[in-house]
Amino acid sequence: MSVLGVNMSLSEKQILDMKLILVFALVIFLYISTSVRNDKRYLLANEVTFKNIEQPLITEEVVNKLLIQNKGSVKNIKKVALALNSIESVLDANPYVRNSEVYVSVNGSVGVDVLQKKPLARVQTKESYYIDEEGKKMPTSPNFAVRVPLVSGDGVESNLNNMFKLLKSIDSDSFYKKEIVEIIVSKKGKYKLLLREFDLFIDFGTTENIELKLNNFKAFYKKATKDKTINKYKYVNLQIASQVICTKI
């Protein structure tokens, strides 16, 4: 009786082990099957989110075309065929894109976060291009015009670094960002600024003491507009950092 009991006990253990193996195998099978079906699912409509886009230079339509690499609608691509890193590389190669992130949710929808480059000024010399927030050149857009200061003059190319310092200061100040419409650069690295609201010509001089000069002019501007005398002036000289020399009409 005891021998039979031992055999019965061993058989039950073997059966239990087999059941556990079958359950484990079933779990693996279901996981693999689900993954395969998930990869073969067609992607749903994507959602594009733009960042740093005060003024657009790239559209959702352009992103979609880059996203699928000219293969048609995003709905025609299976998840397994979407190489996220490759798509991000394609997007990042666009001259208006600073950085991008492409991701696919569990339900198959595609998300794209696009960080657009920010133009600080538009250069108009022998060639036309933007200067971005890193001081690098970027092409103008055939579809959009960005409202930024126009930069011209025969000293642009030889003074790009110093010009960028001035552009950064202008962009960081809401007053100057709104008011400065044109910057003329001489070969000697001297700058002339034109205002949007008033017909006032500013001889800024070099980029030494940028912040001091900008603060001095802003103080003059506030006083002259408050006194309603701003229209009496045609020319303001800021070449001497500690002075604001004005010439009346």
Indicate where each model-derived feature is located.
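N-terminal positively charged amphipathic segments used for targeting/anchoring
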Residues: M1-K65, Q69, V74, K187-I249
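Terminal hydrophobic membrane-targeting helix
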Residues: D39-S128, D132-N143
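Envelope-exposed proteins and targeting segments
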Residues: L44-N46, I87, A93-R98, V106-V110, ...
